[in-house]
Amino acid sequence: TVSDPPARPAVFHSREELMNYVRELNLYFAIVGRPRY
């Protein structure tokens, strides 16, 4: 089963928080976007 995308905080309190979210999102799309053979 595919996990849900990371939850987006309503407000990013720091640059690190934003970067972590973007990194998790990229990881999520890398997993989800992988072709199924």
Swiss-Prot record:
Classify the source by domain of life.
Eukaryota
**By its UniProt entry, which Pfam families does this protein fall under?**
Hormone_3
Q: Does the UniProt entry include the keyword Transcription regulation?
A: no
Q: Where in the cell is it found?
A: Secreted
Note whether Secreted occurs among the keywords: yes
On this chain, the residues bearing Tyrosine amide are: Y37
Q: Give the primary localization class.
A: secreted
Q: Which InterPro entries does this one have?
A: Pancreatic_hormone-like, Pancreatic_hormone-like_CS
Query: What keywords appear on the UniProt entry?
Result: Amidation, Neurotoxin, Secreted, Toxin
A single GO cellular-component term on record: extracellular region
GO molecular function ontology, one term from the record: toxin activity
Tissue specificity as recorded in UniProt: Expressed by the venom duct.
Q: What does this protein do?
A: Causes hyperactivity such as jumping, rapid circling and tail flicking, after intraventicular injection into mouse brain.
**What protein family is recorded?**
Belongs to the NPY family.
**Additional note from the record:** The mature peptide does not contain cysteine residue.
Report what the protein is called.
Answer: Neuropeptide Y2-like conopeptide
Q: Which organism is it from?
A: Conus betulinus
